[in-house]
A protein has these predicted regions:
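Residues on the lipid-exposed face of transmembrane beta-strands in outer-membrane beta-barrel proteins
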Residues: 53, 108-112, 124, 186-190, ...
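Outer-membrane beta-barrel "beta-signal"
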Residues: 50, 57, 384-394
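Transmembrane beta-strands of outer-membrane beta-barrel pores
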Residues: 57-61, 126-132, 208-212, 272-280, ...
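Outer-envelope beta-barrel architecture signal
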Residues: 47-49, 106, 118-120, 196-202, ...
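Outer-membrane beta-barrel biogenesis signature
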Residues: 30-52, 60, 64-72, 190-193
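Cleavable N-terminal export/targeting peptides
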Residues: 1-42
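Extracellular/periplasm-exposed beta-strand and loop segments of Gram-negative cell-envelope proteins
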Residues: 64-73, 77-101, 131-180, 210-247, ...
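Outer-membrane beta-barrel proteins
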Residues: 35-42, 111-116, 189-195, 257-263, ...
Length: 394
């Protein structure tokens, strides 16, 4: 809901917002809905302080993940089970974009006019969306087959780690990714020209944006094969985690134009924020073995090994331009309804999907032998770009 006070009138606003984020890593394509309530203008002798609250309903095209879980038909040979490209193999989770569903949020905006004619003022806003989450959970006593695919850097071919296979192992795969998105600004506004029903103002201030993703992969595999060299009942718990965060801080510059004709209002806004993205990434993995009542934990999972595990940071120049257009209609004294579009372009956002390297040197799997081979998986801040969009209705 939005409650706004201003002169000469206030009202319901219908905003259609499109936000485009150019990302480092997988993209974030968002579609948003801003659903404010009818608002009424203050009387002529009211104060200069104004406050508004918005309910947001956004959908974000989230993180692009590589294939993470596979299966194969019954009767598939063990060496082909879950292997990408093998006959009958299919992807159960991954090779897709996650966290692109509708989610709710709130935005608060406050401002103050320094003069009674409302030509000079300040304003600030904050928005936050609820956390988006995607889960995958699968368990099997052996059938169906469950596997985690990877590319074997030593054999130079596709391979898979089995969590469930008939007569060999029984287990499960559990994956969860969460995503958050929020932002704020603080602006100084001053009118620079007024010609009849047309008014132009400039903006200068500070802008902040935050994007974060957390991906956790947990697998279990319990040995069911008798005489295979590993005691029956031995359980392997393998964990990989990937976290990515981007924080933008920048100088926001812009101009606003307003045109009124009878009950109609047209407002456009063009801004650009120049600053820096502070990108951070954390990769961790572990393998716990439970056998005969004894438990041992070693560093390294499957896709998070000694070659890429750790904490990383990066600072890069970033640009956040924005173009907005709103149309309003005063349908009663002191009331109006509005609709519009907003386009934001954010460069350099890091996502977890592009932190994942699916090429693995088996010699680095715990217990690591260190017998040579490439340092894979490897870490890198991915520089691919995408076009996240946000649409809004109110």
């Amino acid at each position: 809901m939005r409650f706004t006070s201003f002169r000469p009138f206030a009202g319901i606003t219908l905003n259609i917002v499109i936000i485009v984020l150019v990302t480092v890593g997988a993209g974030a394509l968002a579609v948003a809905a801003d659903l404010p309530a009818v608002t009424k203008a203050p009387p002529p002798d009211s104060g200069r302080l104004w406050v508004e609250f918005d309910y947001l309903a956004w959908t974000v095209k989230g993180d692009k993940l590589p294939p993470l879980v596979t299966t194969s038909p019954p009767g598939t040979p063990q060496v082909q089970a879950g292997v990408l490209g093998a006959p009958g193999a299919s992807v159960l989770f991954g090779d897709s974009t996650v966290n692109d569903e509708w989610r709710s949020g709130l935005r608060a905006r406050m401002g103050y006019w320094f003069d009674s004619r409302r030509r000079i003022g300040i304003e600030g806003s904050f928005f936050g969306l609820e956390q988006a989450s995607t889960e995958f959970n699968a368990g099997s006593a052996g059938t169906p087959i469950l596997a985690r695919p990877f590319f074997d850097a030593l054999a130079n071919q596709q391979s898979a780690a089995l969590s469930a296979f008939p007569g060999l192992v029984a287990g499960s795969v559990n994956i969860n990714e969460t995503s958050r998105f929020l932002g704020a600004d603080a602006l100084y506004r001053q009118q620079i020209g007024s010609w009849g029903s047309e008014h132009f103002s400039v903006l200068i201030g500070y802008r902040y944006l935050h994007s974060s993703d957390k991906l956790g992969i947990a697998t279990t595999a319990t040995v069911t094969l008798v005489g295979g060299g590993v005691p029956v009942g031995t359980t392997f718990n393998v964990s990989d985690s990937f976290n990515a965060t981007s924080n933008f801080h920048g100088l926001d510059l812009g101009i606003i134009g307003e045109f009124t004709q009878g009950p109609w209002l047209l407002e456009w806004r063009a801004k650009v924020a120049l600053g820096a993205n502070f990108n951070e990434a954390q990769i961790n993995g572990s393998t716990t073995t439970i056998s005969g009542g004894a438990t041992a934990t070693l560093p390294g999972g499957l896709l998070a090994l000694s070659s890429n595990a750790g904490s990383y940071s990066q600072t890069r120049f970033a640009v956040v331009p924005e173009i907005a257009l709103k149309v309003g209609y005063q349908f009663a004294p002191g009331w109006r309804i509005m609709g519009g579009y907003d386009l934001i372009y954010w460069t350099g956002v890091q996502r977890t999907g592009n932190l994942i390297d699916t090429t693995v040197n088996p010699n680095l799997l715990p217990p690591s032998t260190g017998l040579g081979g490439p340092q894979r998986p490897q870490f890198q801040f991915n520089r691919h770009r995408s076009w996240p969009r946000v649409s809004a209705l109110a």
